[in-house]
Amino acid sequence: MKMKFIFSAAAIALAALSAAAQETPKAPEYEFTTVKENPITSIKNQYRSGTCWCFSALSFVESEILRTKGYELDLSEMFVVGKSYRDRAVKYVRLDGHLNFAAGSSFGDVFHVLNDYGIVPQEAMPGFNYGTELPEHNELDAVLKGYVDAVSAKPNKVLSTAWLRGFDAIVAEYFGEYPETFTVDGKEYTPESFREHVGFNMNDYVNITSFTHHPFYEPFIIEVCDNWRWDSAYNLPMDEMMEVMYNAIDKGYTIAWGSDVSEKGFTRDGLAVMPVEETKAAAGSDQERWVGKSAETPQEEVKAALPEEMVITQEMRQDGYDRKTTTDDHGMHIYGLAKDQNGTNYFMVKNSWGVTGKYDGIWYASDAFVRYKTINIVVHKDALPKHIAKKLGIK
């Protein structure tokens, strides 16, 4: 009798599960059709480092070189990261530690490094002088922060003449020495002459954002910790910022994109959407930090809500920024435009988490997500629609 009861209970449970499965709607499958796709270089992997700002901005620069020169290059991220850390250390000590000193930074940081120090190919400075084949910076970040904090405390009451040399020595041990010269296609270059060879000019690029706490059509310093160089961005209404992005892709340009990615709609499966249902921000940086440790992270509830997205307003953008639900989490590289089977627009995004996910390292970010969660973008000034360039006084 007891055995019969167990079997009966099991049968009832199985029947209930079967009924529930029949009632649960199948998660939709997205079918993307590419509208416009501009050239990009290969997918890279920032791995265990907070250097998305460098990977994404250099990816953008590589696409610009492809567009203007036809050269397909792999530029050294760690050349840029090392130079950036040094500049930040100097400023941090000058300000007695009253500055953000961490792994994160901004697109403008990359442009300043290229302008001030030049650039080298990846093979000239891989930056893996610590026993791994991918970036792992937790130890380095902790060491450098501890070092600059100790220096800033001035235990000798006056700074020594050795502290910056000591900082440089730490960076060199992890990244290797900066090459003074190197050879590409049989020709010798310095970092500065190679920058001239590839034709990069930081004055050709425009930083754009959209917030209401500063006047539109004027530049302001975006108040985020990673903007430690205090670079300015031109402030446009949201619709005009989006117009710049669509125009850039249509005219053959790509876009450096800084965005919040803590939303539930930013998934492991290569999607970035804003479901109508209220979403909760996730804790965490980079792939594990933003979308979970494993592919087993449940996404069914997100997928089920995807077909209907929020209608984003300028006020919603501002509220997210003011309440810190929209922050400068992650830098990526937008290079194309696609539509799903319902005709919804998606920007095609090159990420820096390696060849991973459903689309092999590419994400599809919906118009709604980009409107809501963009912190800033960088584009070539010629990508601006003429009427917007005129409003900004850009020629």
List the model feature ranges, each with a label.
Residues 27-256, 357-359:
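Active-site nucleophile-adjacent alpha helix/oxyanion-hole segment immediately C-terminal to the catalytic cysteine
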